[in-house]
Amino acid sequence: MANLKAVFLICIVAFIAFQCVVAEPAAEDSIVVKRSIGSALKKALPVAKKIGKIALPIAKAALPVAAGLVG
């Protein structure tokens, strides 16, 4: 579920960035976009940290197995 939330937030940030480039917003729009991006990043950062804490031990455990298959 955390992965889904992170992907969703990344998609929102990408969509906002795309709209900034395509729509050429006014100054008021730029302030709203900056706040939206800041809010999305604040929400995505804790999720990314949780995913990292889970993924790192898995990667450490999988590395010797992968090395054994290759070597």
Curated annotation (Swiss-Prot):
Disulfide bonds: none annotated. GO terms for biological process: defense response to bacterium; innate immune response; killing of cells of another organism. Residues 1-23 form the signal peptide. Its main location: secreted. GO terms for cellular component: extracellular region. Residues 24-35, 65-71 form a propeptide. Thermostable. Still active at 100 degrees Celsius. Keywords: Antibiotic, Antimicrobial, Cleavage on pair of basic residues, Cytolysis, Hemolysis, Immunity, Innate immunity, Secreted, Signal. It is found in: Secreted. Homomer of four to six subunits. Female-specific peptides with potent activity against Gram-positive and Gram-negative bacteria. They have as well hemolytic activity. This is Ceratotoxin-A. It comes from Ceratitis capitata.
